[in-house]
Amino acid sequence: MPCEGTENTLAQSIARQIVDVHPTGFGTVDRKKLDAALMFSQQASQAASMCADACLNEGMIKDMRECVRSCLDCADVVDATVKCLSRHAGWAESAVPAILTAAIAALGVCAHESARHASMHMHARLTAETCRKAETACSELLESLTK
């Protein structure tokens, strides 16, 4: 079992190792930006799923309805994005820019909605922070693809 805090580094290095030995080499994609987008997106998807569940268990479910919806939408869109980023398909010419754009939007909405509840619920604060990191990483990767 890995030491505490090493799980993300391990996952990142495995993704990087596979990219490094992939027959296409993933073309000219910026590997550091790809690594960051994959790592932070995986974290955001997990945080959003867990936050939705936590919201459902709060006493004020009516107030949390939009947070639950945005978290579930975010998790689904970001999961699909991670899958697309994990395979090389021509990148700029493929659906990758479109799905990255969708992920950036979903992450932004989830971060905004979660932040509205952050002062009362720690899970919402953590989700908002994690989604913002993933939003930034995905934006940077998208920008590098469209240059």
Regions found by a protein language model. Give the residues of each.
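Amphipathic alpha-helical hairpins
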Residues: 2-147
